[in-house]
From Swiss-Prot:
It comes from Mus musculus. InterPro entries: Carbohydrate_sulfotransferase, Gal/GlcNAc/GalNAc_ST, P-loop_NTPase, Sulfotransferase_dom. The lineage of its organism: Eukaryota, Metazoa, Chordata, Craniata, Vertebrata. This is Carbohydrate sulfotransferase 2. It catalyses: 3-O-{N-acetyl-beta-D-glucosaminyl-(1->3)-beta-D-galactosyl-(1->3)-N-acetyl-alpha-D-galactosaminyl}-L-threonyl-[protein] + 3'-phosphoadenylyl sulfate = 3-O-{6-O-sulfo-N-acetyl-beta-D-glucosaminyl-(1->3)-beta-D-galactosyl-(1->3)-N-acetyl-alpha-D-galactosaminyl}-L-threonyl-[protein] + adenosine 3',5'-bisphosphate + H(+); 3-O-{N-acetyl-beta-D-glucosaminyl-(1->3)-beta-D-galactosyl-(1->3)-N-acetyl-alpha-D-galactosaminyl}-L-seryl-[protein] + 3'-phosphoadenylyl sulfate = 3-O-{6-O-sulfo-N-acetyl-beta-D-glucosaminyl-(1->3)-beta-D-galactosyl-(1->3)-N-acetyl-alpha-D-galactosaminyl}-L-seryl-[protein] + adenosine 3',5'-bisphosphate + H(+); a 3-O-{beta-D-galactosyl-(1->3)-[N-acetyl-beta-D-glucosaminyl-(1->6)]-N-acetyl-alpha-D-galactosaminyl}-L-threonyl-[protein] + 3'-phosphoadenylyl sulfate = 3-O-{beta-D-galactosyl-(1->3)-[6-O-sulfo-N-acetyl-beta-D-glucosaminyl-(1->6)]-N-acetyl-alpha-D-galactosaminyl}-L-threonyl-[protein] + adenosine 3',5'-bisphosphate + H(+); 3-O-{beta-D-galactosyl-(1->3)-[N-acetyl-beta-D-glucosaminyl-(1->6)]-N-acetyl-alpha-D-galactosaminyl}-L-seryl-[protein] + 3'-phosphoadenylyl sulfate = 3-O-{beta-D-galactosyl-(1->3)-[6-O-sulfo-N-acetyl-beta-D-glucosaminyl-(1->6)]-N-acetyl-alpha-D-galactosaminyl}-L-seryl-[protein] + adenosine 3',5'-bisphosphate + H(+). Belongs to the sulfotransferase 1 family. Gal/GlcNAc/GalNAc subfamily. Glycans are attached at residues 243, 457, 475. Homodimer; disulfide-linked. Homodimerization is not essential for enzyme activity. Signal peptide: none annotated. One of its GO terms (biological process) is carbohydrate metabolic process. The gene is Chst2. It is a single-pass type II membrane protein. GO terms for molecular function: N-acetylglucosamine 6-O-sulfotransferase activity; sulfotransferase activity. Residues 1-20, 97-128 are annotated as: Disordered. In brain, it is expressed in pyramidal cells in the CA3 subregion of the hippocampus, cerebellar nucleus and Purkinje cells. Expressed in peripheral lymph nodes. The keyword Disulfide bond applies.
């Protein structure tokens, strides 16, 4: 047998395996990895292994993100959409209440009288207990016990009705609304909130002013029911959301309820006087649930806002039979508003941009304002720059919205009759006590000597207005007429062009010459039509 021929194997025997080739030979024998245009592929099995690991990690990350998203949605639905509450006024609610508390059952023990400040579901509107249903007669409880059970709910109010009185101070920026709001913030019988819709505008920025009106109304609807958890929906990113406290609410550092006992020992609610925000910021933060409990103790709830542009936006709230809402429309000479906006233009630049975005692009504009806004080389800090342009441009939207509101008020629908009051800032600073009494009578509050003295002190001080966002005692005459020396005649005519309709209704006379503007002995106030 030749040496080159293979040796025959016995029957049933397996051939002996050949020795393994070196790794370099194996790689050389492998076919080249397929390549596609525009796509890189691993050049070796080791690269393929790394590629597969990266793909697995990426898929696992996407799966984890999907799971976390679903858990977040379930957590939101669990906390923000509780079980449907049974309507106590409906047939089913009455039946459940009778079965649970024994009302109306023969031989059952009488129900205990409700506590004056018991915690209730924040989404349930304030409803006083009906006479004869689960309530102990006053004769049985005694007059002293009945008065003690009411507590602060009826103190200092006119009439003593059972329904909670709700008030919305409807105004715009730089109209003296901070001072006007203090007339309610300082009242011991009032729960006051300072511009809560600010949270909506900040969260939904850069939405224009008109598109945010519905969200603003929804927030007010919740707040008037003492559902303060609505602040969590619009809390800033990274602020904790569900862990938001009282000090995270806009304007809380000067709120008398937040800074007074029992929430904070720094002040006493019954003592009239401005709150120092530096002191209030040191108060311990309180949970919103605790703030809600304080809200339900007050029979009068007042919200001041500048971000609702038309009273018709509030129509659903005014029509709601569960809410006894009244609107106080605080107005000011639009020329004074424009002057104050220019002076504080950099502090309001964000809001001015949101308002300017709501302008009608078909509206006529006077050429000098457009030139001022796009002036080449204009400095941000100088007059005639972009900040001035937005400050004056916002007046167009503000005055158009004011004209719609005043037109509605001149021919009020049923939902507005008896629920609307116009207050001019010039009348407030000219005769603060008379205006205070008129406002308090409208909302059913009693005027105390301390509040009268507070109003007088705030309008007869000598403080400077160099800080436009700080409430302080100032000279009323200087504050009302400052625009006549601060604005140019062209700026005055621009504002009058935008605002001639509301000016005519509210009794603000237009000027014809620069000399007439500078003549401070001549009043430009006339009797308003409202």
């Amino acid at each position: 047998m030749s040496r080159s021929s293979p040796r025959a194997l016995p029957p049933g025997a397996l051939p002996r395996p050949l020795p393994a080739a070196p790794a370099a030979v194996q790689r050389a024998l492998l076919p080249p990895w397929p390549r596609r245009a525009g796509r890189r592929w691993p050049a070796s099995p080791l690269g393929m292994k790394v590629f597969r690991r990266k793909a697995l990690v990426l898929c696992a990350g996407y799966a984890l993100l999907l799971v976390l998203t679903m858990l977040n949605l379930l957590d939101y639905k669990w906390h923000k959409e509780p079980l449907q509450q049974c309507n106590p006024d409906g047939p089913l609610g009455a039946a459940v209440g009778a079965a649970g508390a024994g009302w109306g059952r023969p031989g059952s023990p009488p129900a205990a009288p409700p506590r004056a400040h018991s915690r209730m579901d924040p989404r349930t509107p304030y409803r006083p207990p009906a006479a004869g249903v689960g309530a102990v007669p006053a004769a049985a409880a005694g007059s002293a016990g009945a008065a003690a059970s009411l507590g602060n709910a009826t103190r200092g109010t006119r009439g003593g009705g059972d329904k909670r009185q709700l008030v919305y101070v409807f105004t715009t920026w730089r109209s003296g609304s901070s001072f006007f709001g203090e007339l309610f913030n300082q009242n011991p019988e009032v729960f006051f909130l300072y511009e809560p819709v600010w949270h909506v505008w900040q969260k939904l920025y850069p939405g224009d002013a008109v598109s945010l009106q519905g969200a603003a109304r929804d927030m007010l609807s919740a707040l008037y029911r003492c559902d303060l958890s609505v602040f969590q929906l619009y809390s800033p990113a990274g602020s904790g959301g569900r862990n938001l406290t009282t000090l995270g609410i806009f304007g809380a550092a000067t709120n008398k309820v937040v800074c007074s006992s029992p929430l904070c020992p720094a002040y006493r609610k019954e003592v009239v006087g401005l709150v120092d925000d530096r002191v209030c910021k040191k108060c311990p933060p309180q949970r919103l649930a605790r703030f809600e409990e304080e809200c339900r103790k007050y029979r009068t709830l007042v919200i001041k806002g500048v971000r609702v542009f038309d009273v018709a936006v509030l129509a659903p709230l005014l029509k709601d039979p569960a809410l006894d809402l009244k609107v106080i429309h605080l107005v000011r000479d639009p020329r004074a508003v424009a002057s104050s906006r220019i002076r504080s233009r950099h502090g309001l630049i964000r809001e001015s941009l949101q308002v300017v975005r709501s302008r009608d692009p078909r509206a006529h504009r006077m050429p000098f304002l457009e030139a001022a806004g796009h002036k080449l080389g204009a400095k941000k800090e100088g007059m005639g720059g972009p900040a001035d342009y937005h400050a004056l441009g916002a007046m167009e939207v503000i005055c158009n919205s004011m004209a719609k509101t005043l037109q509605t008020a001149l021919q009020p629908p049923d939902w507005l009759q008896g629920h609307y009051l116009v207050v001019r800032y010039e009348d407030l600073v000219g005769d603060p006590v008379k205006t205070l009494r008129r406002v308090y009578d409208f909302v059913g509050l009693l005027v105390s000597p301390e509040m009268e003295q507070f109003a007088l002190n705030m309008t007869s001080g000598s403080g400077s207005s160099s800080k436009p966002f700080v409430v302080s005692a100032r000279n009323a005459t200087q504050a009302a007429n400052a625009w006549r020396t601060a604005l140019t005649f062209q700026q005055i005519k621009q504002v009058e062009e935008f605002c001639y309709q509301p000016m005519a209704v509210l009794g603000y006379e237009r000027v014809n010459s620069p000399e007439e503007v500078k003549d401070l002995s001549k009043t430009l106030l006339r009797k308003p039509r409202l």
